């Protein structure tokens, strides 16, 4: 784990020196990993179409949280705009997050962060406690389904988001037969 820095980090300087660290398919770099939370810089464009489900996020600032949800994942868009695709109330929904805006995503919400070219954001998540499970889901977007239909789901304990997601996403991208929807037989796009 990274120790707490002894001096402030000037993010613009860090970014100028490290932007090459933000590479596909996930495009993230861990800026800080403490006992309670992880702070990541994330760049665009990313090359993924999975929906991440994080069951561990707990809101520490109740005034920011909706009454319906006390679990959160924090997004702050530093440069450019992004799109956060979610599955909410058994339907797909797109949430634009513009430059300078922040958004708190309820925990256990399937979400796909779509990051465009030359965009930068910060994402904060809680550390995963022992026994917690993250999920990567891929949904069929080609068939005529009444509700979101999962093609594939990978369940794992996440200890390092930057290294664990990449091989799972790459396996999805390379396995055409594994991208076939069992209900409609359509093959999902790799990215």
Swiss-Prot record:
One of its GO terms (molecular function) is ferrous iron binding. Keywords: Cytoplasm, Dioxygenase, Iron, Metal-binding, Oxidoreductase, Pyridine nucleotide biosynthesis. Its EC number is 1.13.11.6. Catalyzes the oxidative ring opening of 3-hydroxyanthranilate to 2-amino-3-carboxymuconate semialdehyde, which spontaneously cyclizes to quinolinate. GO terms for biological process: 'de novo' NAD biosynthetic process from L-tryptophan; anthranilate metabolic process; L-tryptophan catabolic process; quinolinate biosynthetic process. One of its GO terms (cellular component) is cytoplasm. It catalyses: 3-hydroxyanthranilate + O2 = (2Z,4Z)-2-amino-3-carboxymuconate 6-semialdehyde. The lineage of its organism: Eukaryota, Fungi, Dikarya, Ascomycota, Pezizomycotina. Pathway: Cofactor biosynthesis; NAD(+) biosynthesis; quinolinate from L-kynurenine: step 3/3. Substrate binds at residues 73, 115, 125. This is 3-hydroxyanthranilate 3,4-dioxygenase 2. Fe cation binds at residues 52, 73, 111. The keyword Ribonucleoprotein does not apply. Signal peptide: none annotated. It is found in: Cytoplasm. The gene is bna1-2. O2 binds at residue 48. It comes from the Eukaryota. Its main location: cytoplasm. Belongs to the 3-HAO family.
């Amino acid at each position: 784990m990274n120790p707490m820095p002894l001096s402030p980090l000037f993010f613009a300087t860090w970014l100028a020196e490290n932007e090459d660290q933000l590479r596909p398919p996930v495009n993230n770099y861990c800026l800080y990993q403490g006992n309670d939370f992880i702070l990541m810089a994330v760049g665009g464009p990313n090359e993924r179409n999975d929906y991440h489900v994080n069951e561990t996020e707990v809101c520490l600032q109740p005034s920011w949280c909706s009454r319906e949800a006390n679990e959160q994942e924090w997004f702050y868009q530093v440069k450019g705009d992004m799109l956060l695709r979610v599955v909410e109330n058994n339907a797909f929904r797109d949430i634009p997050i513009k430059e300078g805006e922040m958004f708190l995503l309820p925990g256990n919400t399937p979400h796909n962060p779509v990051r465009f070219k030359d965009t930068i954001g910060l994402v904060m998540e809680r550390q995963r406690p022992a026994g917690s499970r993250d999920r990567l889901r891929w949904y069929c977007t080609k068939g005529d389904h009444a509700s979101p239909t999962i093609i594939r789901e990978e369940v794992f304990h996440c200890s390092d988001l930057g290294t664990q997601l990449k091989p799972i996403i790459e396996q999805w991208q390379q396995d055409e037969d594994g991208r076939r929807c069992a209900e409609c037989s359509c093959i999902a796009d790799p990215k």
